[in-house]
Amino acid sequence: MGQIKVRDIMTTQVITVLETDTIRDATITLAVDTLSGAPVIDDDYHLCGIISEMDILNLIMKYEAELKVENPVLHLLAFPMDTKFDDPDLEAAAAKFSKTPVKDIMIRDVITTTPDAEIVDTLALMLEKDVNRVPVLEKGVLVGIVTRSDIVFSIYKRKI
């Protein structure tokens, strides 16, 4: 049996975020599509980085130190993003958080693979670097993504 290539199991309809999107936009994308992270691209589908739930949560925690309100993180987490707050400092922080560009908090140093790479090698890299997803690039353009879930599903389907 031949080696399984990344192209055999990768997802080709990749949900992405633009580097110019706001954190509000990215949060909506991740929440609606129930994703823990997504590739960040430019207008030409070139990979710029990755944004994850952790990046967004770290940004929320940043405001903990800046605000004088008791438990500001609870305020930011407990209400929808479009909520207007009575406290002007909290309102300003919520607006600043929502309008922060994705490019300001995304991870830029991203592990990538190609469609012709062997999935076993990609999995080993994912485990070594402790990443959930690896963008698949062809000539610098995002053509897919392979996730731990894709690999587990392939094991279930006996592709691996």
Q: Can you name each region flagged by the protein language model?
A:
Residues L127-K129, R133-V134, R148-K159:
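Gly/Ser-rich helix-loop-strand patches that form or flank binding pockets
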Residues D33-T34, D130:
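Short, basic and Ser/Thr-rich N-terminal targeting/leader segments
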Residues L57-V73, V152-I160:
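A short, polar/charged loop-to-alpha-helix boundary motif
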Residues S36-K68:
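Generic detector of contiguous secondary-structure segments
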Residues G49-L57, L137, G144-I151:
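Short hydrophobic beta-strand motif reused across regulatory alpha/beta modules
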Residues M1-T29, L35, V40-D42, L47-C48, ...:
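Bateman/CBS regulatory modules and CBS-like beta-alpha motifs in cytosolic regions of diverse proteins
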